[in-house]
């Protein structure tokens, strides 16, 4: 399963939900919406 908004993540292994337009922030290390 992919990671939802606000979940902690690893930028080098981005597991955030792409279908929800989420991406792992390299700065904050959590899933945020890509605009």
Curated annotation (Swiss-Prot):
A GO molecular function for this record?
sodium channel regulator activity
Q: Does the keyword Transmembrane helix apply?
A: no
The protein's UniProt keywords, in alphabetical order, are: Disulfide bond, Ion channel impairing toxin, Knottin, Neurotoxin, Secreted, Toxin, Voltage-gated sodium channel impairing toxin
SUPFAM superfamilies attached to this UniProt entry = omega toxin-like
Tissues expressing this chain: Expressed by the venom gland.
Which Gene Ontology cellular-component terms appear in the entry?
Answer: extracellular region
Stored InterPro entries: Huwentoxin-1, Huwentoxin_CS1
> Subcellular location, in the record's words?
Secreted
The keyword Lipoprotein appears for this protein? no
Q: Which domain of life is it from?
A: Eukaryota
Q: Which cysteines are joined by disulfide bonds?
A: 2-17, 9-24, 16-31
Q: Name one Pfam family in it.
A: Toxin_12
Query: What's its job?
Result: Gating-modifier toxin that reversibly and voltage-independently inhibits human Nav1.1/SCN1A and Nav1.7/SCN9A (IC(50)=111 nM). It also shows moderate inhibition on Nav1.2/SCN2A (1 uM inhibits current by 55%), Nav1.6/SCN8A (31%), Nav1.3/SCN5A (27%) and Nav1.4/SCN4A (23%). This toxin inhibits Nav1.7/SCN9A by interacting with the S3b-S4 paddle motif in channel domain II.
Q: What is known of its domains?
A: The presence of a 'disulfide through disulfide knot' structurally defines this protein as a knottin.
Q: Which family does it belong to?
A: Belongs to the neurotoxin 10 (Hwtx-1) family. 22 (Htx-4) subfamily.
User: What more does the entry say?
Assistant: Negative results: does not inhibit Nav1.5/SCN5A, Nav1.8/SCN10A, and presumably not Nav1.9/SCN11A voltage-gated sodium channels.
User: What is the name of this protein?
Assistant: Mu-theraphotoxin-Hd1a
Source organism of this protein record: Cyriopagopus doriae (Tarantula spider)
